[in-house]
Curated annotation (Swiss-Prot):
It is a single-pass type I membrane protein. Residues 20-459 are virion surface. It is found in: Virion membrane. This is Glycoprotein. Homotrimer. Interacts with matrix protein. Interacts with host TRFC. Interacts with host BST2; this interaction inhibits viral budding by tethering new virions to the cell surface. Interacts with ITGB1. Interacts with host GRM2. The lineage of its organism: Viruses, Riboviria, Orthornavirae, Negarnaviricota, Haploviricotina. Disulfide bonds join C43-C302, C54-C226, C80-C113, C178-C188, C208-C247, C242-C271, C363-C370.
Length: 524
């Protein structure tokens, strides 16, 4: 039953070139018809590995996505904000103390932030102490500033990891996106100038636990790898594959949307940005199992039809429809012309809509043109009805289309949410509502003598002091001059002595002040 199961993935591969699932296969090239015997009929071999000529199988190990892998990978992290709490204390002349608390920010260092986070997670008692405001100090007639630098740790802060480019997405990032954590850059900037985001685990690889190791068989021909048989026995071709990294792991995105870490020496181009990877979930596996069962039934139906032909020695158009090749590639086409069994080499292609096969009434499109019927008969059981319509006896199971629709709707999305900076604090005052300080570093500054006056009061006081000093200087200078004048007068009197004479009184000359005084007293 394994060969029948191998039909599944090859059936999907060509259809995904167009991004759709095939509902039918029709020859795009049809060789000349030649009569054959009934014993030459055979069920088609739908193994792509044989179509490509890759018959050399060798065991190898590869990685693929885990079953049940969820596209939204969450990365636990935390935010770290640098906060400076300042206590300003002033003691006035009478000893009254006034304390004012202020909060500012600074840019934190990533290493210090991770150490602070470890303190908080470990429940270190120093963390509780760091939640307090700095203890204010005071000095008489002086302003004392006491500051404490703290690292605010807010956790958890969860970001989404994009596996395609390892970018991180969160509303706290500028434009909603961070290009990821690398060896040289261990943090992401945020909408707040003094806040950074860091993952709890330094290595993002721990968040990319989406792979599983598997073993399969690599199919090659002459050193060229054509495809491989996976762990479940399904063959997957490398035709149309492109290079794609998931979480930094190099691999290939196959045309059916699956991803494997297979390495090949062939020159394969990188995938364009719109090439996504299909999820590998339980629902997909369940439908895949139903599809495989359906394909096995078709294989069994082909063998039953062939057995009936061999037993009854008769062929009908309906039975020939079972011999049609179900996957694109080289095969055979059968028909009956004039009661003669005919065979032709054909190359089948997949079609998505019936309009590709029957573009107009009575037209069966083969190789870009309407194929002419012979007596109302085309090939592979396709005939022209009495009303002129083309009648195709079979079509693919609806389960196949259901499976492809599931794959197309379940892809790993590229997440580009729009960041709303207004939802994140921008001003320093808003940060006080949710900060939790950490790692205190207390500093104290003592100012010069301060009378507690405002700036204009200080200038007024200085002007008054200068004016008082000027008045005092003038007063002192004036006093000094008067004292000097008195001293000089007295010194002159002492130097003149008895030589001093006065105007005569009553015709007498008074020789001295003492004589004048004595005479005055005698006269009295």
């Amino acid at each position: 039953m394994i060969p029948q199961a191998l039909l599944f993935v090859p059936l999907l591969i060509p259809s995904l070139c167009l991004g759709k699932f095939p509902i039918y296969t029709i020859p795009d090239k049809l060789g000349p018809w030649s009569p054959i015997d009934i014993h030459h009929l055979s069920c088609p071999n739908n193994l792509v590995v044989e179509d490509e000529g890759c018959t050399s199988l060798s065991g190898f190990s590869y990685m693929e996505l885990k079953v049940g892998y969820i596209s939204a990978m969450k990365v636990n992290g935390f935010t770290c904000t640098g906060v400076v709490t300042e206590a300003e204390t002033y003691t006035n002349f009478v000893g009254y103390v006034t304390t004012t608390f202020k909060r500012k920010h600074f840019r934190p260092m990533p290493d210090a932030c991770r150490a602070a986070h470890d303190w908080k997670i470990a429940g270190d008692p120093r963390y509780e102490d760091s939640l307090q405001n700095p203890y204010p100090d005071y000095h008489w007639l002086r302003t004392v500033k006491t500051t404490k630098e703290s690292l605010v740790i807010i956790s958890p802060s969860v970001a989404d990891l994009d596996p395609y480019d390892k970018s991180l997405h969160s509303r706290v990032f500028p434009s909603g996106k961070c290009l990821g954590i690398t060896v040289s850059s261990t943090y992401c900037p945020t909408n707040h100038d003094y806040t950074i985001w860091m993952p709890v685990e330094a290595r993002l690889g721990t968040s990319c636990d989406i792979f599983t190791n598997s073993r399969g068989k690599k199919a090659s021909k002459g050193g060229r790898t054509c495809g491989f048989v996976d762990e479940r026995g399904l063959y997957k071709s490398l035709k149309g594959a492109c290079k794609l990294k998931l979480c930094g792991v190099p691999g290939l995105r196959l045309m059916n949307g699956t991803w494997v870490s297979i390495q090949t020496s062939d020159d394969i181009k990188w995938c364009p940005p719109d090439q996504l990877v299909n999820l590998h979930d339980f629902h997909s596996d369940e439908i895949e199992h139903l599809v495989v069962e359906e394909l096995i039934k078709k294989r069994e139906g082909c063998l039953d039809a062939l057995e009936s032909i061999m037993t009854t020695k008769s062929v009908s158009f309906r039975r020939l429809s079972h011999l049609r090749k179900l996957v694109p590639g080289f095969g055979k086409a059968y028909t009956i012309f004039n009661n003669t069994l005919m065979e032709a080499d054909a190359h089948y292609k997949s079609v998505r809509t019936w309009n590709e096969v029957i573009p107009s009434k009575g037209c069966l499109k083969v190789g870009g043109r309407c194929h002419p019927p012979v007596n109302g008969v085309f090939f592979n059981g396709i005939i022209l009805g009495p009303d002129g319509n083309v009648l195709i006896p079979e079509m693919q199971s609806s389960l196949l289309q259901q499976h492809m629709e599931l794959l197309e709707s379940s892809v790993i999305p590229l997440m580009h949410p729009l960041a709303d900076p207004s939802t994140v604090f921008k001003d320093g005052d808003e940060a006080e509502d949710f900060v939790e300080v950490h790692l205190p570093d207390v500093h104290k500054q003592v100012s010069d003598v301060d009378l507690g006056l405002p700036s204009w009061g200080k200038y007024l006081l200085m002007s008054a002091g200068a004016l008082a000093t000027l008045i005092l200087a003038i007063f002192l200078i004036t006093c000094c001059r008067r004292a000097n004048r008195t001293k000089s007068t007295q010194r002159g009197h002492r130097e003149s002595g008895g030589k001093v004479s006065v105007a005569p009184q009553n015709g007498k000359i008074i020789s001295s002040w003492e004589l004048y005084k004595s005479e005055s007293e005698t006269g009295m």
